[in-house]
Amino acid sequence: MKTLNDFNFENKKALIRVDFNVPLNDNFEVTDTTRIVSAKPTIIKILEDGGSCILMSHLGRPKGVQDEFSLRHIVNKVEDILGVEVKFVDDCVGPKAEEAANNLNPGEILLLENLRFHDEEKQGDKEFAEALSKLGDIYVNDAFGTAHRAHASTTIIAQFFPERKCFGYLLTKEIESIKKVMETGEKPVLAVLGGAKVSSKITIIENILDKVDHLIIGGGMTFTFIKAQGGSVGDSICEDDKMELALEIMKQAEAKNVQIHLPVDVIAANAFSNDAETQILDVTQIPNGWQGLDAGPKSIENFHNVVMQCKTILWNGPLGVFEMENFAKGTIALGNSIAEATKNGAFSLVGGGDSVAAVKQFGFEHKVSYVSTGGGAMLESLEGKTLPGIAAILE
């Protein structure tokens, strides 16, 4: 696996695919800088070697050229974070971009305009990828967030750098963290899967049953499993058409000696609202008119005990509707348990959408071993898929 450390970038132009797809407010100010901060170590290493950096990224889902999606909006923020002046060119291929790249001196940074202003980027167009490849000497992929897309800048471009392509530090760390959970992690291994729907996690569950010793299932998907086993779930979210599948998963887990832990009690509410009346109920005895919106106190205690005995932990998906304060306790408690286990030497990886948001919101970001930057890419890795952006560097 070729990484940044396999190259010396002195007098070289590094063409880096970063993931600067960051959220902007109405004034076009960056509201979450995580992805820019995550790219910093790669960029700084290249500059310190005596090289220059040409950064390419997408932003949002523009239809053609739309100013609101221009990467020039983020130039100042990128400069603040890197502590280096960032030049900007308002295209990513063609004479303008080539001239700007050619004029770049060692120690300098150039940010190209949004790749997705060209439809060829998402189409994985070979000629477009070749035009991009003219800008640099060494190709560095450091964008885990788009590694599951076979786009021009993430995958197709690598073929134009057969000997001069590598992973940046961020992508290397992502690959190593997933490998640790899925292959080399110290046992017992625990996966915590939450979120609303079983259907979105089926492939992950099937793939990880061979790799884990314990599986905690929480969040909305709980109720499909409970109802499938004959419990009453009231008005809780439930995928009736997935109940047979839930039973099949339970059967597979038993055959593979994986212990599945479901909530035993819930915080139930008489409406989907933070102001609703609530009560603690047995998870199998929720009356009509009530819905489970968070894990209850007994469940929290049970989950804590499971977490504390595990050495490798994957957390994907919250245990309740944490966006509402009254239904955040389960998710916060789980975060505390995982933080404590990590402090005691466990390896913990948090990844996939909502759990990342929860970890940030409740301040666990620096108390776990690693927080993944890729939503869809992380999920596809856990499903056992080879991501095109990663395969393109390994080939």
Model-derived segments and their meaning:
Residues 1-395:
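Active-site loop-to-helix "anion-binding N-cap" substructures in soluble metabolic enzymes
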